[in-house]
């Protein structure tokens, strides 16, 4: 998992509350277990005018030239609600997003973001509204998200602070997913197995 330290990136606006996981990545695209290749289907029903995904909807915000290459998604309350699917953060990450800023998230989606190297920032509704105004009026506006300092710096230079669980912060900052955390305990696991082979050798008989 790629470490998350400081992110300087274009912020794309998705001015909709209660965006559910079926809108983030529709169910017909959940047929594989690899984590890549989902970005093209992100927000499929909004991004495209046809089922095949060949005709872009010019009215949808992410299709606007000003948001090309965006790595931060600025959105509204209760993002990621609906059915549980880890494909939702996979699709966002595969598209290019590394962080989301919103007033609130659905719990399962919120947890899945951390497990997949994405930082879901929670700011107050009025702070999100300020960022919406400053970004919408500034083409190519970039935000800076500093995980160590737990700050978001807007286009005007105003700094917002956010909270993040210390363990999740440690994992993101060091690029550690569940497998990475386990591998860090490799020497202890090896010592345990060695001891176990001595006292319970029958467990290792093939």
Swiss-Prot record:
Pathway named in the protein's UniProt entry: Amino-acid biosynthesis; L-leucine biosynthesis; L-leucine from 3-methyl-2-oxobutanoate: step 2/4
PANTHER family, A to Z: 3-ISOPROPYLMALATE DEHYDRATASE SMALL SUBUNIT, 3-ISOPROPYLMALATE DEHYDRATASE SMALL SUBUNIT 2-RELATED-RELATED
Function: Catalyzes the isomerization between 2-isopropylmalate and 3-isopropylmalate, via the formation of 2-isopropylmaleate.
EC code: 4.2.1.33
Reactions mediated catalytically: (2R,3S)-3-isopropylmalate = (2S)-2-isopropylmalate
Alphabetized UniProt keyword annotations: Amino-acid biosynthesis, Branched-chain amino acid biosynthesis, Leucine biosynthesis, Lyase
Name recorded for this polypeptide: 3-isopropylmalate dehydratase small subunit
GO molecular function: 3-isopropylmalate dehydratase activity
InterPro entries assigned to the protein according to its UniProt record, in alphabetical order: 3-IsopropMal_deHydase_ssu (IPR004431), Aconitase/3IPM_dehydase_swvl (IPR015928), AconitaseA/IPMdHydase_ssu_swvl (IPR000573), IPMI_Swivel (IPR033940), LeuD (IPR050075)
Listed GO CC annotations: 3-isopropylmalate dehydratase complex
Subunit (UniProt): Heterodimer of LeuC and LeuD.
One Pfam family in the UniProt entry: Aconitase_C
Family: Belongs to the LeuD family. LeuD type 1 subfamily.
UniProt-listed GO biological process terms: L-leucine biosynthetic process
């Amino acid at each position: 998992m790629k470490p998350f330290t400081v992110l300087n990136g274009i912020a794309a606006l998705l001015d909709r509350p209660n965006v559910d996981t079926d809108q983030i990545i529709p169910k017909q695209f959940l047929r594989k277990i690899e984590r890549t290749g989902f970005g093209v289907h992100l927000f499929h029903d909004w991004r495209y005018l046809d089922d095949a995904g060949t005709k872009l909807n010019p009215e949808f915000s992410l299709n606007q030239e000003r948001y090309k290459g965006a790595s931060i998604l600025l959105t509204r309350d209760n993002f990621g609600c609906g059915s549980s699917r880890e494909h939702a953060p996979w699709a966002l990450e595969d598209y290019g997003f590394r962080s989301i800023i919103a007033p609130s998230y659905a719990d399962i989606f919120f947890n899945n973001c951390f497990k997949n190297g994405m930082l879901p920032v929670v700011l107050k509704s009025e702070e999100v509204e300020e960022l919406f105004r400053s970004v919408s009026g500034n083409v190519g506006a970039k935000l800076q998200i500093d995980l160590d300092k737990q700050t978001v710096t807007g286009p005007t230079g105003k700094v917002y602070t956010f909270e993040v669980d210390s363990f999740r912060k440690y994992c993101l900052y060091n690029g550690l997913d569940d497998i990475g955390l386990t591998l860090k305990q490799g020497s202890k696991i090896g010592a345990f197995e060695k001891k176990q082979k001595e006292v319970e050798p029958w467990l290792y008989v093939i």
